[in-house]
Each structure stands twice: as structure tokens, then as C-alpha cells.
């Protein structure tokens, strides 16, 4: 009998492997991405102090995402999190894709964050 592991379980294993080697500091925090079926979330995290410096998601009221596609929404979230991070004085981050493939919504968010001023 063929048993196939659930996609989310394999993603969590992949994320745990990467997180063992990847940490964010105050000088270079971690840009974490979480993707659900309907929304996408991004946080800039200082792992040394255990503090979220900046966050943005498709649930934010100020983004006005009515009627946009998922990749367009991810692009706006990437721009928003980058602008907020630059305002807080963060210019360089470590990108943590959360175990997701660098494709689609995750890629759109990352490229928008780069264009808005974050370096990674």
C-alpha cells in the first residue's frame, strides 16, 4: 500500500530543518512567511530577543485588498512589510520561506520586499 505524507507535514519538516540553521539577529532579522489557503502573512523577527519587529498580512485593513488575486495580494504584503521594516531602520534581513517552495505567492512577496528596499 502506498502511503503519501501530507504536504503540510513535509513542509513542517523542511521548515524545522532550515530553522535549525537560520536565525535572525537585531542587525539582520528574519523575514518569515506563512501562507494559508486564503491569506499570506509576513513577519520580521529578531530571534535573539524573541521579538517581532514588523508584520503585515492580507488581513490588514490599510492594504485594501478587495478583488485582488493571491499573487497581487502577496506583492502588496511584501511591499508593506518592507516599508514598515525600513521605517524601523531594518535594511537587511534573512529570508525564511517557511518550508514553502520559492514560487508563486512566496516569490511575489519576496520580490516585492526586495524592490521596496529590503536586502536579502
From Swiss-Prot:
GO terms for molecular function: 5S rRNA binding; structural constituent of ribosome. GO terms for biological process: translation. Residues 1-24 are annotated as: Disordered. Pfam families: Ribosomal_L18p. One of its GO terms (cellular component) is cytosolic large ribosomal subunit. Keywords: Ribonucleoprotein, Ribosomal protein, RNA-binding, rRNA-binding. InterPro entries: Ribosomal_uL18_bac-type (IPR004389), Ribosomal_uL18_bac/euk (IPR005484). Residues 9-20 have a biased composition (Basic residues). This is one of the proteins that bind and probably mediate the attachment of the 5S RNA into the large ribosomal subunit, where it forms part of the central protuberance. Belongs to the universal ribosomal protein uL18 family. HAMAP family: Ribosomal_uL18_B (MF_01337_B). Part of the 50S ribosomal subunit; part of the 5S rRNA/L5/L18/L25 subcomplex. Contacts the 5S and 23S rRNAs. This is Large ribosomal subunit protein uL18. It comes from Bacillus mycoides (strain KBAB4).
Amino acid at each position: 500500500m502506498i502511503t503519501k505524507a501530507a504536504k503540510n507535514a513535509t513542509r513542517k519538516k523542511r521548515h524545522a530543518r532550515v530553522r535549525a540553521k537560520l536565525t535572525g539577529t537585531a542587525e539582520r532579522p528574519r523575514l518569515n512567511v506563512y501562507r494559508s489557503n486564503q491569506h499570506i502573512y509576513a513577519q520580521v523577527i529578531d530571534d535573539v530577543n524573541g521579538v517581532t519587529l514588523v508584520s503585515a498580512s492580507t488581513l490588514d485593513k490599510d492594504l485594501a485588498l478587495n478583488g485582488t488575486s493571491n499573487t497581487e495580494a502577496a506583492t502588496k504584503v511584501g511591499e508593506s512589510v518592507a516599508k514598515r521594516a525600513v521605517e524601523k531602520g531594518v535594511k537587511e534581513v534573512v529570508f525564511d520561506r517557511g518550508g514553502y517552495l520559492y514560487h508563486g505567492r512566496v516569490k511575489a512577496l519576496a520580490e516585492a520586499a526586495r524592490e521596496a528596499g529590503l536586502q536579502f
